[in-house]
């Protein structure tokens, strides 16, 4: 089993991270090789509004013509990435920020012409990640990628899943502001994709948790061994390195 763990932190969480989160990263780093992938949706939306550019999404993906891609790149690879790197370093964690363009890290296939510069991960070149980790740095990845010398926006969840699959990671951890999946007020500690589908159909999982668990299932189908959904505002890592939250694993007949 691989000793890599990929942590995905959504853009809406970045300004809420506290000392507990960084202590958990330190605990993970004692057991595993850690990679962090971040989003940046709220900051991108705010910057687009300042530039008088419409925010449009289709099927959960940001419509990204050239002028939007310029803003996405500026925010994700610039202010958002460096803010997280600086925060990690403030907590005595050695971090290096980079994007999916660096070292040909994230190579993408365009999704469709209708939504512009949006890509799906086609191939992950892991050499840069492994090199940084071998020098005891935490790679902090902005989810943009390349295709034919053009830069593309990537959904941060699928970017994290692609990286985790390429590294044969032990675990992909989604940082959220809730404890995990709740059923009748109680935390569901372990589940699989069949039970997740049942939960959605029966209204147990609703609202913003649906895309999180769908991303977890997609990650498993890409080859990730297990996915945990945890509350980044609380201590989500046990001393053993196990996560406190909802852990989703493969069912017996997952495709």
From Swiss-Prot:
Pfam families: AA_kinase
Cross-referenced InterPro entries: AceGlu_kinase-like_sf (IPR036393), AcgluKinase_fam (IPR004662), ArgB (IPR037528), Asp/Glu/Uridylate_kinase (IPR001048)
Principal localisation: cytoplasm
Entry keyword annotation includes Transport: no
A cellular component annotation (GO) from this entry: cytoplasm
CDD domains for this protein: AAK_NAGK-like
HAMAP family xref list: ArgB (MF_00082)
Role summary: Catalyzes the ATP-dependent phosphorylation of N-acetyl-L-glutamate.
Entry-linked NCBIfam families: argB
UniProt-recorded name of the protein: Acetylglutamate kinase
Lineage: Bacteria, Bacillati, Bacillota, Bacilli, Bacillales
Gene name of the record: argB
């Amino acid at each position: 089993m691989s000793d890599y763990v990929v942590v995905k932190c959504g853009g809406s969480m970045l300004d809420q991270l506290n000392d507990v989160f960084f202590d958990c990263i330190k605990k993970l780093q004692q057991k595993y090789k850690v990679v962090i992938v971040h989003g940046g949706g709220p900051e991108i939306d705010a910057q687009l509004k300042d530039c008088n550019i419409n925010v449009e999404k289709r099927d959960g993906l940001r419509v990204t013509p050239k002028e939007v891609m310029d803003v996405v790149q500026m925010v994700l690879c610039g202010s958002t990435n460096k803010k997280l790197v600086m925060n990690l370093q403030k907590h005595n964690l050695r971090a290096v920020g980079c994007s999916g363009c660096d070292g040909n890290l994230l190579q993408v296939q365009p999704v469709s012409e209708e939504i512009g510069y949006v890509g799906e991960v086609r191939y992950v070149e892991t050499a840069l990640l492994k090199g940084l980790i071998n020098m005891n740095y935490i790679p902090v990845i902005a989810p943009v990628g390349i295709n034919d010398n053009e830069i593309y926006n990537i959904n941060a969840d699928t970017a994290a899943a692609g990286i985790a699959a390429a590294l044969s990671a032990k675990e992909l951890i989604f940082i959220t502001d809730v404890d995990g999946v709740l059923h009748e007020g109680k935390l569901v500690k372990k589940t699989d994709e069949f039970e997740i589908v049942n939960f959605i159909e029966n209204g147990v999982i609703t609202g913003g948790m649906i895309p999180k668990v769908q991303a977890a299932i997609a990650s498993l189908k890409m080859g990730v061994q297990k996915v945990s959904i945890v509350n980044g505002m609380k201590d989500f890592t046990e001393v053993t390195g196990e996560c406190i939250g909802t852990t989703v694993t493969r069912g017996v007949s997952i495709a």
